[in-house]
Amino acid sequence: NGIRKLMERAVPQGTPESMIVKVHETFTEHYKKHCADKTRPYDGIKELIENIRNAGVYTAVVSNKADYGVQILCKDYFPGLFDYAVGEREGIRRKPYPDSVNEVLRQFDVDRTQAVYVGDSEVDVQTAANAGMDVCMVGWGFRDEEFLKENGAEFVVHSPEEAWEFINK
């Protein structure tokens, strides 16, 4: 999980550490300039986040993407819609460790029992469990419903409207 792990998986087995470092540096330089290429929010997501905010609920992003990429994407695609965003950075272990979630909860001074984790991958299922939070998995993102359920998801929504119903209950 995370960019470094992606680089390790992308190069041939046995690649020297110095080359992995160079590949990581090259990727990072490229990604900083192009992280939003061919990216867009799923239909209905901005409206979902607006509904959540209009209900007086804090909104946040936790991601294994590099923190600079998370900040850029939130600013470009969701200006003013997230109260906090945290990506991969020093001092915070990547998901499925709950570190990023715990940071968000501390930032807002909110108890985990009053929060809902929304995710689209098996790593998100694990992260929510590790954080001791209710989870709303979405079936239109990185993984489909069947895969999510095979990997521990108990409940999967199929639209932003269904997600809002789950969050708003």
State what each model feature region is.
Residues 1-47, 54-58, 68-71:
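N-terminal helical cap/lid subdomain that shapes the substrate entry/recognition surface
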Residues 79-94:
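A short, structured active-site edge motif that brings together acidic residues
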Residues 95-125:
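Conserved Lys-Pro-Asp/Glu-containing loop-to-beta segment of HAD-superfamily phosphomonoesterases
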